[in-house]
Amino acid sequence: PKFTEIGRSTMEAKIIPSLWFDNNAKEAMNYYVSVFPNSKIKNIEYYPDEKLDEHFVGMSGKVLNGEFSLNGLDFICLDGGPIFKFNEAVSFTVTCKNQAEIGDYWSKLSHVKEAEQCGWCKDKFGISWQIIPENLGQLMAKGDKAVQVLMKQKKIIIEEFENL
């Protein structure tokens, strides 16, 4: 999107998801770039000496700003302590070409069995993912029977929709 302000030139706004980890941002970045193709860690800055500011107490050496990309999508993250927790109100959707791809991402990203439902899963860092076929809209167009199939699934099984 482009935004114009009085006295300023037109600029493009870039939206970048920001992830607040307790104290394992570097581990998470390394993990995610191993899961998704065309991914990399771009930059990591660490908290300075904790004596510089009262907010840095106990944070020296942890990630202050991590920048990484997953299959071309930029993310930023930090170690911010246990103040905030991830929940299902925000999730990332991975669209897959086929059942094999769904299975691959599911095996890498689903670590909380009780969170598995309708293609949703939660990884070991608490982030929610939706692992879905890229043609889910077509599969769901089959009506109430498709909804019933989806509601019974944890990992989506494409064949169960095709057999309706």
Protein language model regions, located:
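A short, polar/charged loop-to-alpha-helix boundary motif
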Residues: L136-M151
